[in-house]
Structure formats: structure tokens, C-alpha cells
Swiss-Prot record:
The keyword Glycoprotein does not apply. Keywords: Chromosome, Cytoplasm, DNA-binding, Meiosis, Nucleus. Residues 1-50, 122-343 are annotated as: Disordered. One of its GO terms (biological process) is epigenetic regulation of gene expression. Residues 52-130 form the H15 domain. Residues 150-183, 199-219, 235-247 have a biased composition (Basic and acidic residues). This is Histone H1.8.
Amino acid sequence: MAPGSIASSDTSSSTSSSSTSSASSASAEGSSRPLGSEKPGLARGAVRAPRRHPPVLRMVLEALQAGERRRGTSVAAIKVYILQKYPTVDALRLNHLLKQALATGLHRGLLIRPVNSKAKGATGSFKLVPKDKRKIPPRKTAPRMPGQAEGKDPKKPSESKKDPANTVEVKKGSRKPREERAAPSKPGAAKKAPKKGTQTKDPEPRLGEAKKSSRRPDKAAQAPPSAGGPGGKSKVKERGSRQADTKAHRKTQPGSQSSKSTVTKGENGAPLAKKKMGGKVPKEAAGEGPKAKAPVPPKGAGSKKEPGPLAGKAEASKGPRKPGIPTKSSVSKAASKKAEAEG
């Protein structure tokens, strides 16, 4: 082989080996680099730039503190203050953000409107509330995560399932009073049983008889007051006639011990008879005087033997008295005097 051909083959092999070595070194470097070391693109969200201004509500509070007035600060003055102090604020979005900030300030009790203000929304004027009078409303708790809510929600249905069990227990408890209500009905049946017998009916007529017996003494008690009525005069007349008869009988008896006689008193006493007779005593009896009274007969005398004629005389005396006819008592006395004269 010619020497020139050998040299050309050596150079071609050296160039191929160098190319393979460079490729292997490049592959080794690529494998040694970490996968996440590549810089993320702008679409994935680059690092946020720092805020160019504080929250709008804080800026509003600063504006109100800077320009405190008696009647409050207008919304236009607040907006001018914010744009001058924080020029980086977007003027186009500021109107919307300012409206939200004022609403939240009123809700939290940080801002108030003047007394006579009737404005609404992002209009009118506002004032700061003093720190002493601020009322911080309770903050709302953070909403639960969906996983936690799913884990706790199933417990609520279990509680709701327990409630029907409680209602069943309440129903069972309500049945017991019904049984108790049914139990008192048994004494009612026992009350009905005695009605069949006659023992319960006996006390009622007995009570009726007792009432009748109690009424009878009332009538008897009412009888004595009637003595002073129209029938009382007839009874007094009967008593007077009986006394006159007893006097005449005593005078006719031969075995009388004394010439004096005592006047027998009735239930109401002899003075009643004297009052009724009054000045109607006949002259013959008045002439005899008190000494002409008949002697008192013994206890077994004949005053008791003549109940029949006395009853008849009493019945006769009940009739109407005529002015011209003398009383029977005077007739009986006259007859007794004739008998004495004949004796």
C-alpha cells in the first residue's frame, strides 16, 4: 500500500473519535443537570413583585386622619389625597376599590357618616370613629375544607336518625298515661255495681222521712204564737167559762173545807183571762167580793169528772157573741145562787 493512503486513514479515524468523545461528554453533562433546574416561563407565574401601595381601606383611614373636619371629609378629597401620596395606584380601578373600602369601613364600625347626611355608596362625606367608641364585630369563622365538611356531615344525619328514636320513646311514654287513664275506669264499674242492690236506695227515703219528721215539730212550734191571733179569744173564753163552772161546783159541794178558792192557772196563767174579761164581769160577781170565792177542793175532786159538759160549753162559746144576750158564765153563776138560796 502507498504511504499516502495510510496517513489519510489515520486522520479520518482521529476525527471520528474526537467527534464521539465530544458527543459523549455533552450527553454526560446533560444527564448530570437536574430536571427542575430549568427556569419556569412567565405563564407558570413568575415571582410576584412587591406591592406598590397599601390596602385601599388603610389609605382611606390615613386620608381621614390627615384632613379631619367637623363635618367629615368628602369622597373626592379622599381620592385626591390617595393619588397624591401613592401615584402608583391605578386611577381607573380606584373608583371601584374606594367604594368597596368605604362599605367595609362602615360595616366594621371604623367609619361613620355625619348626622344629617343622606348620601349612599361612594358619595357624601365620612368621619372616623373614635377608638373608645369602636365596636369590633365578631369575625366570621373560616369556611371548612370540603374534606372536613364531608367527614362531619354524615354525623348530622345520624343525629337526625336518633331523633326519631326519641320520638318513639315519647310515644311509648304517652301510651303509659293512656293506660293510667284506662285504670281509673275500673272504680267506675265498681260504682255501677252497687246500683243493682237496694242498699244504696234505702238511705234516700230515710233522709226524706227524717226531713218530714223535722218539719212536723216546726208546725208544733209555730202553734203557740197563734194564741194571740183571732183564735186566741175563743181559747180565753173557754178558760173563763171553765173557771166559772168550777167555782159554782165548789159552792154546791157540802163538804168543802174552806170558803176561799184559788184560781187555777192555765198554760198562759189566769191573769190573761182577767185582762180579756176586763170590765165585762157581771155586777153580781162584783158584789160578792173576794171573800165569796169557793174553797179549794181536794186533788181528787169533781173538776176532773165533768170534761164532757165543759167541752160542750166551750164549743158553744165559740159562736159569735150578740150584744143583747148575756154570757153563759153569768147564767151559770145565777143558777148556782138559786141553788144556794133553796138550800
